[in-house]
Regions:
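Extracellular glycan-modifying ectodomains
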Residues: 1-337
Length: 337
């Protein structure tokens, strides 16, 4: 959670919370509706100011261990590991302090448990802030394996997980590559994302094969126009673009692709929104700004489909549909870029 979500009384007087549910609350309501295994850390962290740095937007070691215990519980492990009490002091310069006082920032004392140092970095990463970190814990030869998609909030979270798992991979790269062989390698997969980055779920959907669907077409929707682009992104073909209208509740977007042998398969596309800021919004790990050229407002779509035997699929072999699997309508695809 954002620091301001947990401690709104610490915000300036002119900071006024908006009406209605927050994006955080809407996300967790939707995850519950879809029965996604999600851990809401807000209840775990609320009320304890000792869990976040004073002059930093992130949680400190205390907060990270609260999060660690809750996440491990969400993974089905009955008891969180006891890391003991702090027996060392580190120093940390907060991101807020560095922004507000670049010349006079004051490092904060960070009580540290050396029991969290029971791991080694197994790749060429220099530390927990690197975008891709592989770890090994020699004390856990029969332990589990972990893949964590994460952001900077996991800088303090990484040591506890790295010390718990025999082997672990921590990556900041987005979009998430859910087709990566590492997903199969890991016994546990965790997605940690800061509240302030929730919106990028809508702008950077993960790399993964679009789910196959069997659709029933009810004909053509007259007057509807779509802009579509097809590009190669090995091992995928990416079909993306924008609709000229909002989808009604329950409607989805499908792309139908004819293969080299004449076979036809429909896939469900991700709904995608246009990034509101630059592609470096997600801590410098964002995807190319090129995506925004055909994704407009919140009417975008993107599907990663398998390549045909001949490589790129010809443009004439693709049709776009909106609706549901049981009843959808083809929309015009003449405007192809």
């Amino acid at each position: 959670p954002n620091k301001s979500t947990l401690f709104p009384d610490g915000m300036p007087y002119y900071y006024v919370r908006g009406e209605g549910p927050s994006i955080y609350e809407r996300l967790y309501a939707r995850l519950a509706e879809l029965k996604v295994n999600a851990v809401d850390l807000r209840a775990e962290l609320e009320g304890s100011r000792d869990t976040y740095f004073l002059r930093d937007s992130h949680w400190n070691e205390e907060g990270s261990l609260v999060a660690y215990g809750a996440i491990r519980g969400g993974l089905g492990y009955p008891e969180a590991r006891d890391w003991g009490t702090a027996d060392d002091i580190l120093v940390h310069t907060g991101d807020l302090d560095a922004m507000l006082h670049p010349l006079t920032a004051e490092p904060e004392a960070l009580p540290h448990r050396t029991t969290l140092d029971a791991y080694a970095i197994a790749n060429d990463a220099q530390g927990v802030e690197d975008a891709y970190v592989v770890t090994a814990a020699a004390g856990n030869p029969d332990g589990q394996t972990l893949l964590m998609y994460r952001d900077s909030f996991a800088n303090n979270l990484l040591p506890a997980f790295a010390s718990t798992y025999r082997s672990a991979v921590f990556t900041k790269n987005v979009p998430y590559n859910l087709g990566d062989e590492q997903v199969g390698f890991a016994q546990d997969v965790v997605i940690e994302r800061a509240e302030r980055h929730i919106a990028s779920f809508a702008t950077d959907p993960p790399y993964m094969y679009a789910p196959e669907r069997t659709i029933v077409s009810e004909g053509r929707e007259e007057g509807s126009v779509a802009v579509m682009r097809v590009r190669d992104a090995d091992p995928y073909i990416v079909i993306e673009g924008s609709l000229d209208r909002d989808l009604k509740k329950g409607e989805r977007v499908y792309v139908e692709v004819a293969g080299d042998a004449g076979e036809v398969q429909a896939y469900e596309a991700f709904r995608v929104s246009e990034p509101r800021v630059s592609s470096s919004d997600f801590e410098g790990q964002g995807a190319s700004a090129q995506q925004a050229s055909v994704i407009k407002d919140d009417r975008g779509f993107r599907a990663f489909v398998p390549k045909g035997h001949g490589g790129m699929v010809a443009l004439g072999q693709i049709r776009l549909f909106v609706g549901t699997e049981q009843s959808c309508r083809e929309i015009a695809t003449e405007a192809v870029v």
